[in-house]
A protein has these predicted regions:
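Core alpha/beta nucleotide-donor-binding catalytic domains of modification enzymes
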Residues: 1-205
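Short, structured loop/turn "capping" segments at alpha-beta junctions
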Residues: 185-188, 212-217
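Extended, highly charged alpha-helical segments
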Residues: 201-215
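AMP-forming adenylation/ATP pyrophosphatase catalytic core
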Residues: 5-30, 53, 88-90, 153-160, ...
Length: 275
C-alpha cells in the first residue's frame, strides 16, 4: 500500500462511520488532489459498503470549464462513482474573484451534499495547501490553518455538514507520483499557476520546499494558550513575549477570530492593538 493511500485510509478509519447508510460526498474538481481523495474514498467505502457521490463545481471562469466538468464526470464514472455537476451561475465579480469563487463553491457543495443526504464532504487538501496558507498568512492574508475535520463554512446551507481532509499530511508531489504509478491522468487548471493570485504566488515560492517542524517557541506558545469556559482565551504573557513576533501576532489573530466568532482571522493591525 502506498504512503498517500495509507495516510488517507487512516484518517477515514478515525473519522468516518462504516455502519452509516448516508453517502459520503467528495469535492471533485478532477485535479490531482481531488482524484487522490476520490481513490482513498473508493478504497475505504469498498470495505464497508457506504455509498459515494462526487460533486464537481463548474465555476465558468475558464473557456474549457464545461469540458473539464464532463471529463471529471467521466473520470468518476470509470471508478464507479456517480458525479453531479454543479454550476456557478450569474455575474462574476471583477475584483476579489478567488474569494468569491471559493464562497460560491462551498455553498454549492454544501447544498448538493445535504440534498444527497451526506453529512461528510471529503476535500483533497494536502500538506502543500497547509504550507501555502502559512506563506499567505506571513504576507498578511487572513487565512487560518486547515483542519483534518471542520464544520462547513457556510450557514445555514452547510448546517450539520462536516469537511474531512484525509490527505492533509501528504505532499502533493507524493500524491501525484502515486497517481502516475496507477496510470491515472488528471485535469490541470492553468489558474493554479496564475501569479495574479496570492495562492499561486505562495505555491511558486514553496516549489520543492520541505515542511518545517514547529519550533520549541511555537510549541510553548501553543501550550500557553487555553480556552476559557465563557468562550474567551487566556494566553501566558511570558510565552507570548518569548515567541517570535510573527507567530505571536498570528496567535492573537486566531484568538480574536475564535472569541468573536468571525469567519476569518483578524487583520494584523487589529491584533497588534492588543500588545
Amino acid at each position: 500500500m502506498t504512503a498517500p493511500l495509507h495516510a488517507g485510509l487512516e484518517v477515514c478509519a478515525r473519522r468516518l462511520t462504516p455502519e452509516s447508510p448516508a453517502p459520503i460526498a467528495i469535492a471533485f474538481s478532477g485535479g490531482g488532489d481531488s482524484l487522490g481523495v476520490l481513490l482513498v474514498a473508493k478504497a475505504w467505502a469498498a470495505a464497508c459498503g457506504r455509498p459515494l457521490v462526487a460533486l464537481h463545481v463548474d465555476h465558468g471562469l475558464q473557456a474549457r470549464s464545461s469540458d473539464w466538468a464532463i471529463q471529471a464526470q467521466a473520470m468518476a464514472a470509470r471508478l464507479d462513482v456517480p458525479c453531479q455537476i454543479l454550476r456557478w451561475e450569474g455575474d462574476k465579480p471583477t475584483s476579489g474573484l478567488p474569494a468569491a469563487a471559493r464562497a460560491a463553491r462551498h455553498l454549492l457543495l454544501a447544498q448538493a451534499a445535504r440534498e444527497a443526504g451526506a453529512q461528510v464532504l471529503l476535500v483533497g487538501h494536502t500538506l502543500d495547501d497547509q504550507l501555502e496558507n502559512a506563506v499567505m498568512r506571513g504576507a498578511g492574508a487572513p487565512v487560518g490553518p486547515l483542519r483534518e475535520w471542520s464544520p462547513s463554512p457556510v450557514w445555514p446551507q452547510g448546517r450539520g455538514l462536516y469537511l474531512c481532509r484525509p490527505l492533509l499530511t501528504v505532499r502533493r508531489a507524493d500524491l501525484r507520483a502515486w497517481l502516475v504509478a496507477e496510470g491515472l491522468d488528471w485535469i490541470d487548471d492553468p489558474a493554479n499557476d496564475d501569479i495574479r493570485y496570492a495562492r499561486s504566488r505562495a505555491r511558486l515560492s514553496l516549489d520543492g520546499a520541505a515542511p518545517l517542524a514547529p519550533s520549541p517557541d511555537i510549541r510553548a506558545l501553543a501550550a500557553a494558550c487555553k480556552a476559557t469556559p465563557w468562550g474567551g482565551f487566556e494566553i501566558g504573557r511570558a510565552a507570548l513575549l518569548a515567541a517570535p513576533p510573527p507567530e505571536a501576532l498570528r496567535l492573537l489573530q486566531a484568538a480574536l477570530a475564535c472569541a468573536s466568532g468571525a469567519p476569518a482571522l483578524a487583520r494584523p493591525a487589529r491584533a497588534r492593538d492588543l500588545v
